């Protein structure tokens, strides 16, 4: 037996390159090992580990890892080959059939050839003709601003790109269709990110995945040659099935199976080898959809039967924030996934006794509920109802009659406990009067019973229905429901909060019952279960209801209780403190008016010079100002809570209305100004900063050290602010400031050199308008000329001068000055400054940081990067050679292949840049190690097309070339 295996292995080594892996063959055809022969003769347990390694190597597979891993790798290879052969055979048969049909058709006297484009609109053909013409393409895009943000430079589909661009799918589709050398998708990790991102089950997403599979398969003729060897779905079928299941993407998995016509046995094997059984144990709504789908096409291996929902979060299925249609689908997926009748029988056999009477009772209840739901027709559900949340439906439920629906077919919910469970939900024209709340309750009850029978029957203590289930479906008094909270939920603070808020906001509960609840809490009826220090939970529930009647009743009862208490014993806070503590919950003007008319003397936020106004929601500030102005009172603002989220917005409001606000800042405000700018940039509040700087003059220059640490993460958020800062700053004024640095460099020691410069931003009506236009495009807040340039009179308030600001100063480092100019598309100005002041800008202490990889990598485009490279080549010196090398490293890391192709096409540049410096070639700039590092960066970034281009062109030794190629093979 061993000798026979040895012969087979030798045959593999001699013949494995031949493509004859037909799974239906009875033996080894022409000496080749087939899937059946492999499974028959090479058992994972008895086969020698060394023999498996030889087979793996002969097939071009990795041979490292444990024995079972190597075995699974070989098995997966054969499964993929089977799918590929089936796909090829199908296409061959279709081509032969098509050829026969064409031969049978009468031949025209003169042949006419028509080029057709599948799935492409006629007008789109002209677009692609322009798009693929590099000369026209570059000419068009050279006229666009913000070239560094052009999508044609995007390399790789990472989370930043996929989540940061709302049209990321369209960009990928355009890039695939363009079929140019600059492909966004570079490797399998990019594909995995795509699978993790696009999961919606609609026609657009399904079409997207079909395009993806057609381009990245071994039969594709459109794919660039360099990518076809690294990404082929049909060469790695089992691994892609694993990735789609683990990323819980039903749409991709469904289209993948259909596109490549993968049979159930291949899917079963792939799941068994690569997907852990526990994946389906932690059951979610979306995982259930995949599980039921695989089950419906008979593709679930016996080892992966759905575990009994051990790690399932019941609250996710029963959330009242879910849409009604999701509740129906949850019910469907749960019931379809499990044969409850079979589970009952298995439990009886396992225990060798009849099932516990209580458990049997629950199974019977569930069966009864399923039968009841089978009788429900869904014609009374409108699209609005199906797309509404359960919470909203329960707050507006009335008996509903039959309503118009988009479908006219008739069927019912059909569910049984038999192995052939079936469920359909369509519409019927039958007239019906059914209470929607009762229907929702039946679905909830069924899901609860299902989980109890499947998971919690062995330990009833662990099972409890959500609190909202009792609050919405149990027809009990408020007192009775509160007892349930205490008995079933042990009276936790969170449950008390949920209970009080739900009761007080429920429009279906009578006001008298709510009044009774308030009275019972204040009279200590629940003192044993509701501690006094937890009263703030109840207070918050009352004020958050924003119900004037409830709040008024509550405050009057508090007042009565306080009158009955001695001065030394004050159980509850004062009325004024209560209202002030919860004023942030006020969400409508009527509540403010209510306090103003009835509790003005008690309310702290109606006092003169109060600071509590900062807690009132910004949407209500204008009405609040009107009330304060009507009684001649003012609010106070200092910088004590400068880090609050809306502080700068409130400061801008206060600056514009000095009759209502008094502002007082001492010298410490200069210290916190940087943090204020930083926090508002992170919160996308660039307009708030611009408003502030336009209406308040700092007595010291604004330091922009924040740019040093925060520029990279917040580049797009800062763009409007940067435009505002540099709008009226010319390159000549920057040159003047840099000349001062140059003088200091010549005459002072290094320690005395100040690497920062101070610039002045001039504010004019034109500046304001420009800023406003830009801001309007990028944010929802609009800024007008009027509110930027008022008030007219200046006023000193400590370290600030409030009033119309004509200009302000700021300091910025030379490095960040260059970065800002770059992001404003003022690269021509950078080149101008290079020429005028090379001794300053090319000073390693200043400029080297700008060209460091971590800085320029995040902002560079191929367009500008090539511009810098060409400039450094034309101005080579001891400093610029280092900057040139850094730019080449970035181009390699980002996969800008065209930059290197342009260098190679130039005989002079290629000799300087991409040939190794030796004794015989002193004209070259870089030694072997530096050039090797450039190639390694492209390999580590999985840009293999560029890697192979550089390996072939650079005159590395044979040893170095082999070493680099091995790095590529390991990452493929």
UniProtKB/Swiss-Prot annotation:
GO terms assigned for molecular function: DNA binding
Coiled coil: none
Keyword Secreted applies: no
Transmembrane stretches, start-end: none
Region Disordered, residue ranges: 1-30
Keyword line: DNA-binding
Start-end of Basic and acidic residues biased regions: 1-19
Residues in SAP domain copies: 44-78
InterPro entries: SAP_dom, UPF0746_actin_org
Top-level taxon of the source organism: Eukaryota
Family named by the database record: Belongs to the UPF0746 family.
Name of the protein in its database record: UPF0746 protein DDB_G0280785
Source species: Dictyostelium discoideum (Social amoeba)
């Amino acid at each position: 037996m061993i000798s026979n295996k040895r012969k087979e292995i030798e045959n593999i080594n001699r013949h494995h390159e031949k493509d004859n892996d037909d799974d239906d063959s009875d033996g080894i055809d022409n000496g080749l090992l087939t899937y059946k022969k492999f499974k028959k003769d090479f058992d994972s347990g008895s086969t020698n580990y060394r023999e498996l390694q030889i087979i793996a190597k002969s097939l071009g597979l990795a041979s490292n890892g444990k024995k079972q891993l190597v075995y699974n790798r070989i098995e997966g290879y054969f499964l993929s080959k089977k799918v590929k052969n089936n796909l090829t055979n199908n296409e061959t048969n279709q081509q032969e059939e098509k050829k026969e049909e064409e031969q049978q058709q009468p031949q025209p006297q003169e042949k006419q050839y028509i080029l057709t484009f599948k799935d492409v609109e006629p007008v789109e053909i002209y677009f692609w003709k322009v798009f693929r013409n590099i000369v026209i393409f570059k000419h068009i895009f050279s006229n666009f601003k913000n070239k560094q943000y052009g999508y044609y430079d995007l390399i790789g589909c990472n989370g930043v790109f996929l989540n940061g661009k709302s049209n990321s799918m369209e960009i990928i589709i355009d890039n695939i269709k363009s079929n140019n050398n600059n492909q966004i998708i570079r490797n399998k990790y990019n594909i995995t990110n795509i699978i993790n991102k696009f999961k919606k089950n609609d026609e657009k997403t399904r079409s997207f995945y079909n395009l993806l599979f057609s381009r990245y398969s071994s039969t594709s003729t459109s794919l660039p040659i360099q990518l076809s060897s690294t990404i082929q779905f049909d060469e790695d079928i089992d691994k892609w099935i694993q990735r789609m299941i683990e990323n819980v993407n039903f749409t991709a998995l469904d289209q993948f199976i259909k596109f490549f016509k993968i049979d159930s046995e291949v899917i079963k094997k792939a799941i068994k080898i690569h997907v852990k059984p526990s994946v389906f144990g932690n059951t979610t709504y979306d995982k259930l959809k995949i599980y039921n789908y695989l089950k419906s096409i008979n593709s679930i291996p016996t080892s992966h039967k759905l575990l009994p929902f051990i790690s399932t979060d019941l609250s996710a299925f029963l959330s009242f924030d879910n849409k009604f249609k999701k509740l129906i689908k949850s019910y469907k997926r749960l019931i379809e996934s499990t044969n409850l009748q079979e589970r009952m029988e298995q439990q009886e056999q396992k225990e060798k006794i009849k099932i516990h009477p209580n458990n049997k009772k629950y199974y019977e209840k569930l069966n009864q509920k399923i039968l009841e739901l089978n009788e429900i027709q869904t014609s009374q559900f409108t699209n609005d109802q199906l797309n509404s949340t359960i919470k909203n439906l329960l707050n507006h439920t009335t008996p509903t009659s039959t309503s118009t629906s988009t479908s006219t077919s008739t069927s019912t919910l059909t569910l049984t406990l038999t192995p052939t469970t079936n469920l359909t939900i369509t519409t019927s024209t039958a007239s019906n009067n059914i209470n929607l709340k009762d229907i929702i309750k039946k679905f909830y009850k069924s899901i609860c019973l299902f989980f109890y029978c499947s998971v919690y029957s062995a330990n009833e203590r662990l099972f409890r229905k959500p609190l909202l289930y009792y609050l919405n479906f149990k027809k009990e008094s408020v007192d009775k429901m509160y007892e349930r909270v205490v008995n079933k939920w042990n009276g936790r603070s969170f449950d008390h909060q949920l209970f009080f808020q739900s009761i007080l906001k429920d429009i279906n509960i009578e006001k008298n019952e709510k009044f009774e609840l308030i009275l019972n809490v204040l009279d200590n009826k629940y003192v044993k279960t509701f501690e006094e220090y937890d009263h703030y939970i109840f207070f918050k529930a009352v004020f958050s209801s924003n119900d004037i009647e409830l709040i008024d009743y509550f405050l009057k009862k508090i007042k009565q209780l306080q009158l009955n208490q001695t001065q030394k014993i004050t159980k509850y806070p004062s009325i004024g403190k209560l209202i002030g503590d919860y004023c942030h919950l006020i969400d409508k003007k009527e509540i403010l008016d209510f306090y103003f008319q009835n509790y003005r003397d008690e309310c702290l936020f109606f006092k003169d010079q109060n600071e509590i106004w900062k807690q009132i929601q910004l949407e209500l500030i204008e009405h609040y100002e009107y009330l304060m102005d009507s009684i001649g009172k003012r609010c106070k603002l200092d910088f004590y809570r400068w880090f609050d989220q809306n502080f700068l917005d409130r400061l801008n409001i206060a600056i514009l209305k000095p009759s209502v606000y008094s502002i007082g800042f001492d010298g410490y405000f200069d210290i916190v100004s940087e943090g204020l700018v930083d926090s508002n940039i992170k919160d996308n509040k660039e307009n708030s900063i611009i408003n502030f700087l336009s209406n308040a003059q700092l007595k010291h220059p604004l330091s922009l050290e924040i740019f040093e640490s925060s520029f990279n993460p917040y580049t797009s958020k800062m763009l409007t602010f940067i435009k505002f800062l540099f709008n009226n700053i010319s390159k000549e004024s920057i040159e003047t400031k840099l000349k001062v640095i140059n003088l200091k460099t010549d005459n002072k020691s290094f320690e005395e050199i100040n690497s920062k410069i101070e610039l002045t931003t001039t504010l004019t009506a034109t500046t304001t308008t420009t800023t406003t236009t830009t801001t309007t495009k990028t944010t929802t807040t609009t800024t007008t000329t009027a509110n930027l340039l008022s008030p007219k009179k200046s006023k000193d308030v400590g370290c600030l001068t409030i009033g119309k600001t004509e200009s302000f100063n700021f300091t910025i480092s030379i490095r960040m000055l260059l970065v800002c100019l770059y992001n404003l598309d003022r690269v021509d100005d950078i080149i101008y400054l290079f020429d005028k002041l090379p001794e300053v800008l090319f000073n390693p202490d200043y400029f080297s940081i700008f060209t460091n990889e971590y800085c320029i990598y995040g902002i560079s485009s191929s367009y500008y990067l090539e511009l810098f490279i060409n400039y450094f080549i034309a101005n080579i010196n001891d400093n610029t050679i280092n900057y040139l090398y850094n730019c080449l490293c970035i181009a390699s890391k980002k996969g800008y292949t065209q930059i290197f192709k342009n260098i190679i096409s130039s005989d002079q540049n290629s000799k300087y840049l991409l040939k190794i410096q030796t004794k015989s070639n002193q004209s070259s700039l870089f030694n072997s190690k530096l050039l090797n590092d450039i190639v390694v960066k492209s390999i580590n970034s999985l840009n293999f097309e560029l890697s192979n281009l550089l390996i072939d062109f650079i005159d590395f030794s044979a040893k170095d070339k082999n070493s680099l190629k091995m790095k590529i093979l390991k990452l493929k």
